[in-house]
Amino acid sequence: MTPIESKAQHLLRLRNVSFSYLEGVETLHNINLDLAPSEFHCLIGRSGCGKTSVLKLAAGLLSAQQGEVVWNNQLLIAPQSDMGFVFQRPTLLEWLNVLDNVLLPIALHRRIETSDLHKAKELLQRMGLAHKFHGKPTELSGGQQSRVAIARALITSPRILFMDEPFASLDAITREELQHDLMGICAEHKTSILFVTHDIGEAVYLGNQVSVMAQGKIHHTLAIDLPQPRQNSMRHSPEFNYFSAKLRHAMEVVA
């Protein structure tokens, strides 16, 4: 990566980024986004508005055709080793047990050490899967598979997680449990998160900042000023309803 000037308080910055999949058809236009260390930043918008494309550009999975993506004060041109990824489908390897699936990002680069095993077990215990170390992914529920995917993404101690609607296919109760556990474990590790969702309640519960997208643009970024740590009981509070209504209005205005 190429060192460039950037504000020290920002871990990730997108500046005036535009992108097209097809020549002459602009998918994203003039995207500006800042993400600070330990920040949970949600991207929300209707299907097809460009949320996933922004996430891929921010992660170096796509290259901006205009503007720049700055990661840790360096111009980003490819995904980095201190980035982690969780997508909607956990994509666990069925022939490996749960523990080996979590250790896979390390095993692809070097031999597994005792400290790696301890860390993998601690992450799985934190995700409520201490009894599943040696089980196979096919024996797990959808929520449990998502927990394994999160542990796998955290095993390399990334500075940021890129998450693309990771809980969209889960039932409401499981989704809320995972949201709560994700916030807790990432707060412990001081991990930043860029999180794509179409769910207003999810964005308000998780996000410190929420950017509203429509038609390939970020139209608004709202600060969600709710107490930390977040608790499930908060979902029924007047403050939560206030920010949910504010976010819904922002989405309706730009639709």
Where are each of the predicted segments found?
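Helix-to-loop junction immediately C-terminal to a conserved catalytic motif
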Residues: 59
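The feature captures the beta-strand-to-loop junction immediately N-terminal to the Walker
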Residues: 44-46
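Conserved ABC ATPase signature
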Residues: 136-140, 144
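Conserved ABC transporter NBD signature motif
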Residues: 67-79
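ABC-type ATPase nucleotide-binding domains, specifically the catalytic core motifs of the NBD
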Residues: 22-23, 63, 96, 100-116, ...
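A short, proline-enriched helix->beta-strand linker immediately N-terminal to the Walker B motif
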Residues: 155-159
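Hydrophobic anchor residue at the start of the ABC signature
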Residues: 150
